[in-house]
Amino acid sequence: MKIIFAGTPDFAATALDALIKTPHDIVAVYTQPDRKAGRGQKLTPSPVKQLALEHNLPVLQPLHFKSSTEEGLAAQAELAAFNADVMVVAAYGLILPQIVLDTPKYGCLNIHGSLLPRWRGAAPIQRAIAAGDAETGVTIMKMAAGLDTGDMMFKTYCPIEASDTSASLYEKLAAQGAEAICTVLECEQQLQKFLAEREVQDENQTVYAHKLVKAEAQIDWTQDAIQIDRNIRAFNPWPVAFIPLDDKNNLRVWESTVSKLIAPDAEAGKIIAMDKHGIHVACGTGVVCLTALQWPGGKALNPVQIIQTQKLNIGQVLA
């Protein structure tokens, strides 16, 4: 089949890499415009663009597909000219109007990192961890104009381990998503079968995964230890949980566990112990053990290194 691929980050590049290895013809790759990145703020191509160029695939980077502008209409016409059988979309980042969704013969399929209709939206992986979900997965859906509202065609399931961060779960789901889209697109008859058997989402089961904002990564010590640990894992690698040091500087918390220690009478935020396992901090309920901390301008430190800095003390109350 002739496939158009649209995606931007590593999550999408994993799926594109898998599709490149199939007999299908990748006729075009769409990705977001190059962005400034790194300390030098150099224009950097997305992981999807880098992979596409390595395989000599045509890359297109329109700003939008809006019918209200000449640029948008030109982008629509350019896409239609590829005469694709199907378009695969994974974390692309641009809104696709209905005219684009209807352009390929079999429409547009989306690789979404959750078990829809739970966690529609921008941050499904992070929200699943923060909510304490026992499992998540990947849904392949036929795209509709609404936000992740399309009919579901195929699902894979992935348990969320107690040690999972958004970074580790992201990698697992990227691999599952790549495998899932290759299953759905194994051949044209297989695609027709999945389209015929697709399932409408139950709107009563919908939960939205709202976009992350930096402010919510500040640790609230009045929460229980289990929730604080979930948040720390959910916000790794971005925006990273933090403890304010002063008006401008934060202590970043990369990793944690729920401590076995108990301190029912300790003030929330108080350091009750420091050992080889980590920095044990009293919470609203329970104790959380911080195992990787990063001071401004430094690298992330393990528990032994943290103690050696002598920057934290037992009895100290964290902000």
Curated annotation (Swiss-Prot):
Could you tell me what this protein does?
A: Attaches a formyl group to the free amino group of methionyl-tRNA(fMet). The formyl group appears to play a dual role in the initiator identity of N-formylmethionyl-tRNA by promoting its recognition by IF2 and preventing the misappropriation of this tRNA by the elongation apparatus.
Catalytic activity field: L-methionyl-tRNA(fMet) + (6R)-10-formyltetrahydrofolate = N-formyl-L-methionyl-tRNA(fMet) + (6S)-5,6,7,8-tetrahydrofolate + H(+)
Return the SUPFAM superfamilies for the record: FMT C-terminal domain-like, Formyltransferase
Q: Which organism is it from?
A: Acinetobacter baylyi (strain ATCC 33305 / BD413 / ADP1)
Q: What's the protein here called?
A: Methionyl-tRNA formyltransferase
- Which keywords annotate this record? Protein biosynthesis, Transferase
Q: Which Pfam families match?
A: Formyl_trans_C, Formyl_trans_N
Give the EC number(s) under which this enzyme is classified.
Answer: 2.1.2.9
Which residues are recorded as binding (6S)-5,6,7,8-tetrahydrofolate? 114-117
Q: Which family does it belong to?
A: Belongs to the Fmt family.
- Identify which top EC class this enzyme belongs to: transferase
Q: Which GO terms describe its cellular component?
A: cytosol
On the tree of life, the source organism's domain of life is Bacteria
Q: Which GO terms describe its molecular function?
A: methionyl-tRNA formyltransferase activity
